[in-house]
Swiss-Prot record:
This is NADPH-dependent oxidoreductase. Reduces FMN, organic nitro compounds and disulfide DTNB. Involved in maintenance of the cellular redox state and the disulfide stress response. The keyword Oxidoreductase applies. Its cofactor is FMN. One of its GO terms (molecular function) is oxidoreductase activity. It is an enzyme of class 1 (oxidoreductase). Its EC number is 1.6.-.-. Belongs to the flavin oxidoreductase frp family. SUPFAM superfamilies: FMN-dependent nitroreductase-like. Pfam families: Nitroreductase. The keyword Transferase does not apply. Keywords: Flavoprotein, FMN, NADP, Oxidoreductase.
Length: 251
């Protein structure tokens, strides 16, 4: 890996304020082609990407998300787990492929495919000088997003991505990640609780200092406090039902 690519990836951070400058069609096509170059399990290509250009559709998706940058960006992509085309093949072949793509394994395979495509696009966009932010908030109301985007059975909207030129007011920076030794295990998982807690305490201090410096003392919470707040909430408890309605996790 060249130092350029390494540094580009290391400098990644979410951008939430964009200039009012739409991406051109050629740029959009290049980003999608970069995404399609990602690895795909067994050549299944279990994804579709919806480019949302209609302001009225973006506005409706913003209502679901609650985030202004769903509307105010250079371009909005929605990444869809897609077995609909495989279902069409199955209807002709009559080989009962639904047993596979309607399973939990099928869901995992498809979700991984979509994530790889999206990350390829994110890196390509940042290489072009654009900023990006992922939008998991589109899952706040999956049924409504499916209706807005006219999604058929055997498809599922996983997340979105807003792309564009960062606003002059944008001052984001990379957040400190967990230490290498905390997430990289040699040969077997190291579940030593004492060591893990010790490393987390040190990391919590790093994160707290990061927020304190960036916000001039307004925020001082650490990583453990953040995940306690986030994972302590009961959110999107309808997800299993919505997945089943779309044809997934049937077995």
């Amino acid at each position: 890996m060249s130092d350029y690519v390494y540094e580009l990836m290391k400098q990644h951070h979410s951008v939430r304020k964009f200039k009012n400058q739409p991406l051109g069609s050629e740029t959009v096509e290049k980003l999608v082609e970069a995404g399609q170059s990602a690895s795909t399990s067994s050549y299944l290509q279990t994804y579709s990407i919806i480019g949302v250009e209609d302001p009225s559709i973006k506005a409706r998706l913003k209502e679901v998300s609650g985030q202004p940058y769903v509307l105010d960006n250079g371009y909005l992509f929605v990444f869809v787990l897609d077995y609909y085309r495989h279902h069409l093949v199955d209807e002709v072949a009559a080989s009962n492929m639904e047993t596979s793509y309607g399973s939990a394994e099928g869901l995992l395979v498809g979700t991984i495919d979509v994530a790889l495509v999206a990350q390829n696009m994110a890196v390509a966009a940042e290489d072009m000088g654009y900023g990006i932010v992922y939008l998991g908030s589109l899952r706040n109301d999956v049924a409504r997003v499916r209706e807005i985007l006219n999604l058929p059975d055997y498809t599922f909207p996983l997340f979105g991505m807003a792309v564009g030129e960062p606003s002059d007011e944008e001052n984001g920076s990379p957040k400190p990640r967990l230490p290498f030794k905390h997430i990289f295990h040699k040969d077997q998982y190291d579940a030593n609780q004492h060591q893990q807690r010790k490393e987390l305490e040190a990391y919590d201090q790093v994160v707290s200092e990061y927020y304190k410096e960036r916000t001039h003392g307004v925020r001082t919470e650490n990583w453990s406090q953040q995940i306690e707040t986030f994972l302590g909430r009961k959110t999107r408890l309808d997800m299993l039902d919505e997945l089943k309605k779309a044809g997934f996790i049937q077995r």
